[in-house]
Amino acid sequence: MDIPHEAEAGAWGILPGFGRHHHPSSDATLFSSSLPVFPRGKLQLSDNRDGFSLIDDTAVSRTNKFNESADDFESHSIGNLLPDEEDLLTGMMDDLDLGELPDADDYDLFGSGGGMELDADFRDNLSMSGPPRLSLSSLGGNAIPQFNIPNGAGTVAGEHPYGEHPSRTLFVRNINSNVEDSELTALFEQYGDIRTLYTTCKHRGFVMISYYDIRSARMAMRSLQNKPLRRRKLDIHFSIPKDNPSEKDMNQGTLVVFNLDPSISNDDLHGIFGAHGEIKEIRETPHKRHHKFVEFYDVRGAEAALKALNRCEIAGKRIKVEPSRPGGARRSLMLQLNQDLENDDLHYLPMIGSPMANSPPMQGNWPLNSPVEGSPLQSVLSRSPVFGLSPTRNGHLSGLASALNSQGPSSKLAPIGRGQIGSNGFQQSSHLFQEPKMDNKYTGNLSPSGPLISNGGGIETLSGSEFLWGSPNARSEPSSSSVWSTSSTGNPLFSTRVDRSVPFPHQHQNQSRSHHHFHVGSAPSGVPLEKHFGFVPESSKDALFMNTVGLQGMSGMGLNGGSFSSKMANNGIINSGSMAENGFSSYRMMSSPRFSPMFLSSGLNPGRFASGFDSLYENGRPRRVENNSNQVESRKQFQLDLEKILNGEDSRTTLMIKNIPNKYTSKMLLAAIDEKNQGTYNFLYLPIDFKNKCNVGYAFINMLNPELIIPFYEAFNGKKWEKFNSEKVASLAYARIQGKSALIAHFQNSSLMNEDMRCRPIIFDTPNNPESVEQVVDEESKNMDLLDSQLSDDDGRERS
């Protein structure tokens, strides 16, 4: 039946028929914006944006008429049983507690001043359960204060996602603007020396106080938290800058030490660095023993250690010390890792809200994309007693070294570990090589059956740190190399050679460490491979025999097959004398990113390369490696042997500097050389690629006498370049053309003399050393004596 609206409106002006849906309020109600009517037992607030259910305030004509069903009557009857609005609203307004809600401006200041982060707009996410509560339950250690907004509406985390915590800087809120700076200084200085006191925003209710010692900040926070100052309770938090800290910011008090010898223990480091200040912790980086973090309690100790120990020698290696820069984690992680394992800016990657422990950064399991997955070698390697054992568990690596992913198809690297296989002194070898894109025309048929066997014990492999630092040119370009550090590539392969090495890695390292200074590979490695591999042949004939045997069996034809070897040789890929790097019969198998078939490397023709293995491929075109059994010997003639130089047995003076960053100019190179070797050379030439307007990656320098090569080697070989954030590592070798006169004769009739003066060789006159001065009578050679005008202003030496 028809029921007039006016007659049936409830006490709250709620129309019947709207009982189960929206209840528009009428003007007769107390609150026109009003709350809906619900049964008492089911009163609740929705999770909408403002914490309230939204009510449609559309006016409803009181003259409308409609049919009311039995359900509508029932709803209307229940509505009449509800309490009056005064009883209903009393408890709800108590819960709101609006008088205690914090000022929104305080939260804006707090967020901008102390590096705190709001998960969402604070004012839009307040729940009805009360104001946010600051939890400071355990501020000791690495505990982080956190604002918890009830019902999960939002959190204000006192932890910055890209920094360490707690910090040396305190963010102090609820400051009375009438407090004098001297009063603040006296209050906080009792806990330690204050580095800075920032009071510019004191009138807005907060100040920032920075200590030298992190322990002082912790103690001040514990002692002064909620203590009254001018009738206001102090609200103290650790503060970490939102933006990336600058490279000179030492607030972290943490130093990164590079190029450490693996034999240096944490106790040794503690003794060395502890002389400059009290050390809080020494952390190691997984799989990179040459790379450690030293954290000081006091930043002044870190600054003193940085100045005193940077570029000093420890255990025969020149270390590099830098401040830790946690802000660098904001860069693109995987792209950076794909380019190089050792980006110094990738020290930390914590998640927002997650506590940062004192453990080494970036620990955890990363999926390891196996470089051999899907390749024809997968089944062979999986059954091998050498390759079948991996230092990883379940295909995962922990830490930074394992974070390489598949973005770079030809730079999948995994660190090679060490460990004994059985009891025969074999060293464990993991699969560190790129995915070979193999053609049948190069490989023949690979048999998946049968183990790779060698009875030559004491095979030592490249560890992660040795691969990254001990073999510099392997890092000259991120995708330049992958390594099989075993004595065999056959299936099956039996090596009858007698092992001449020490079968234990530590003994072998001790023996080979003395060779590090005195036997330097020219290319591709600047470090002697007898440190990396377990046995050294007495002659190139030995090495050639081993290499020939090592290639057999890959075609599935057993020891006497030889198909793989012959096919590789016929295609100009393999150098029959090249498998022994620097004359050593440990094998490297490379997979070039620019060339699909595998090739077995070493013994490169020294006159045909520029820098490492990548020189085999220029602009995507393969160079043919000559099949010459004498290449091992010719390789040796370009290696630096410091022992021979000291004994006066080698009088060569012209060197080739390799792996120079392409953006370097002659001026930059001269500046780098003159830091420690000014006046020790009389000729320098940095070849320029005129098309690309950059250098070609190597240079030639002639020293005044052979003895000066030793300090030059110590200053450059195996060191990173400082400019352009380059990851290239310099290496040295003898040049083919020796002596200043021969160099001048080589260049004086070259078309190079018609190019810009900045691209020509530079000759230095050294009147204090008449033996090195050579007069050039050829008219054309006078052009060579013209110097770059830009260099003459910066260089105090006389050049003719």
From Swiss-Prot:
Q: Does the keyword Isomerase apply?
A: no
Any one GO BP annotation for this protein: positive regulation of growth
Q: Which UniProt keywords apply?
A: Meiosis, Phosphoprotein, Repeat, RNA-binding
Provide the RRM domain boundaries.
Answer: 168-241, 253-326
Q: Cross-referenced PROSITE patterns, in alphabetical order?
A: RRM
Q: Where is the sequence biased in composition, kind Low complexity?
A: 471-488
Q: Which cysteines are joined by disulfide bonds?
A: none
- Residues with PTM Phosphoserine: 384, 390, 789, 792
Q: Where is this region: Disordered?
A: 470-489, 776-800
CDD domains hit by this protein: RRM1_MEI2_like, RRM2_MEI2_like, RRM3_MEI2_like
Report the InterPro entries cross-referenced here: MEI2-like_RRM1 (IPR034453), MEI2-like_RRM3 (IPR034454), Mei2-like_Rrm_C (IPR007201), Nucleotide-bd_a/b_plait_sf (IPR012677), RBD_domain_sf (IPR035979), RRM_dom (IPR000504)
Q: Which GO terms describe its molecular function?
A: mRNA binding
Give the domain of life: Eukaryota
The record's statement on gene disruption is: Early flowering.
Q: What does this protein do?
A: Probable RNA-binding protein that plays a role in meiosis and vegetative growth.
Q: What is this protein called?
A: Protein MEI2-like 5
Organism, per UniProt? Arabidopsis thaliana
Organism lineage reads as: Eukaryota, Viridiplantae, Streptophyta, Embryophyta, Tracheophyta
Coding gene?
A: ML5
